[in-house]
């Protein structure tokens, strides 16, 4: 559903399977691109508060701000938004011509707090959902930065009685000048994962590795992540779609194409950043953004199908474009195919230059698994 506010609007999907926790995904956009940044930020923050007043029993559990110029804008977001949740702030310019967009994930009837480890905790029932965002450091290069990020995260998880291999469900890796610095990020992740027992013979973690920068140009790698304390191994399932995609380890990287988590009452599906690839690892339809977009849809559909889901179950999408000149074509395709979905299209180069476009998404489905704990 679309909700209109002063100088902003939100596309929202709510999920209610009849149990205690309702979930909401909202993509908040600025309606008037000619406004100065301060007014655009104000419009987004006011729209967020209007959503909270519409659903007074909800709390934000995760936010991502997409900015057009982090060096000039990020500090203002930090001052304006004092919400007690994980806040991801990244320069990935919204391609509708505005300076800021916000993806916010809300839940009802949960308790939120900041843990001693520095992770944001969302508690309900047996589980503690642990979110972290905008993690960064100033090590010498992208490889050292990413290795330190993962090692610090492993220590944070240990403080929560968790491990990377058993509890981490999703990561986002943002790489400043990805064409130059992605190789270092890949090496660091491969090395850390090997030490943590994450191999081609066990499993990896659903992830997006994408271009994005911070306000400090010396930050070459930023990480957001999500883990679940209390999750059981039998609740976690990995998605492969081998008819459409190959294993990422075939071309030297280490992430899962998708993951779904089952509870007694619902299924959470996390689709990693997905590009126009085939099951040999080749780029499909080089230099044709429309055909690449349609191939992505097909690939994501195949992954969703393995989780017994369709696009009807998708609750949010982020679309990454390498070339701003492709925006009108891609926007028209998405608006025609997904008129009622919360999505945002941002300027962010994909990890391989030949991939012009990439998308990630999350899906939610009501299920009945009486042998599993409730969400």
Describe each PLM feature range.
Residues 1-312, 321-375:
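N-terminal presequence-like segments and the immediate start of the first folded domain
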């Amino acid at each position: 559903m679309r909700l209109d506010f002063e100088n902003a609007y939100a596309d929202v999907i709510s999920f209610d399977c009849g149990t205690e926790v309702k979930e909401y995904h909202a993509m908040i956009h600025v309606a008037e691109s000619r406004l100065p940044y301060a007014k655009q930020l104000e419009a987004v923050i006011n729209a967020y508060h209007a959503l909270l007043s519409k659903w007074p029993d909800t709390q934000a559990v995760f936010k991502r701000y997409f900015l057009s110029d982090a060096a000039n804008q990020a500090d203002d977001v930090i001052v304006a938004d004092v919400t007690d949740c994980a806040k991801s702030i990244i320069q990935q310019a919204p391609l509708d011509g505005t300076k800021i967009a916000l993806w916010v994930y809300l839940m009802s009837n949960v308790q939120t707090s900041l843990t001693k480890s520095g992770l944001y905790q969302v508690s309900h029932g047996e589980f503690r959902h642990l979110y972290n965002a905008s993690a960064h450091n100033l090590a010498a290069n992208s490889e050292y930065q990413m290795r330190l990020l993962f090692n610090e995260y492993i220590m944070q998880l240990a403080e929560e009685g968790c491990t990377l291999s058993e509890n981490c469900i999703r990561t986002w890796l943002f790489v400043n000048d990805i064409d130059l610095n992605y190789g270092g990020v890949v090496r660091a992740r491969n090395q850390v994962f090997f030490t943590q027992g994450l191999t081609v013979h066990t499993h990896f973690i659903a992830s997006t590795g994408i271009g994005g920068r911070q306000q400090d140009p010396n930050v070459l790698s930023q990480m957001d992540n999500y883990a679940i304390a209390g999750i059981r191994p039998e609740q976690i399932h990995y998605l492969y779609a081998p008819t459409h995609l190959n294993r990422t380890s075939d071309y030297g990287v280490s992430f899962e194409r998708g993951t779904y988590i089952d509870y007694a009452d619902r299924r959470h599906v996390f689709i990693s950043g997905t590009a126009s690839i085939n099951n040999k690892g080749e780029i499909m339809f080089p230099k044709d953004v429309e055909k690449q977009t349609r191939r992505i849809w097909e690939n994501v559909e195949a992954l969703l199908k393995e989780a017994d889901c369709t696009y009807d179950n998708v609750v949010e999408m982020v679309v990454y474009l390498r070339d701003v000149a492709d925006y009108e074509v891609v926007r028209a395709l998405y608006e025609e195919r997904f008129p009622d979905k919360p999505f945002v299209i941002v300027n962010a180069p994909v990890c391989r230059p030949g991939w012009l476009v990439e998308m990630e998404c999350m899906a939610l489905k009501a299920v009945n698994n009486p042998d599993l704990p409730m969400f």
